Amino acid sequence: METVEGIMVVTTETIPGYRIVEVKGIARGGIVKATHIGRDIMAVLRNIKGGEVREYTQMMAEAREEALRRMALHAKELGANAVVNVRFATSNVGSSVAEVYAYGTAVVVEKEE
């Protein structure tokens, strides 16, 4: 189980050892991220040669982490201490611009006895 900004975050419907006592709603966080022109140039060169475009891989990893962080902060605002069923969605907004969106169900959980 991962903790982000003090919020438990899981992709499953439940958290082992905890029970859901209240559902607070949908927690969400998103970011639109563009690459730096220098990264774009390197990406074009790698694309010609073939293989992984590390510049974009790094950009998307950073965007996922930030979307997850923003989702956790939204869950806190809702009064939750956990988010279950976490999912990610991505879309291209433009050339070298991507949106990453994290969402899940904000809940209050208590440790089982």
UniProtKB/Swiss-Prot annotation:
InterPro entries (alphabetical): UPF0145_dom_sf (IPR035439), UPF0145_YbjQ-like (IPR002765)
Domain of life according to the entry: Archaea
Family membership: Belongs to the UPF0145 family.
Family matches, as NCBIfam families: PRK03732.1
Protein's recorded name: UPF0145 protein TK1926
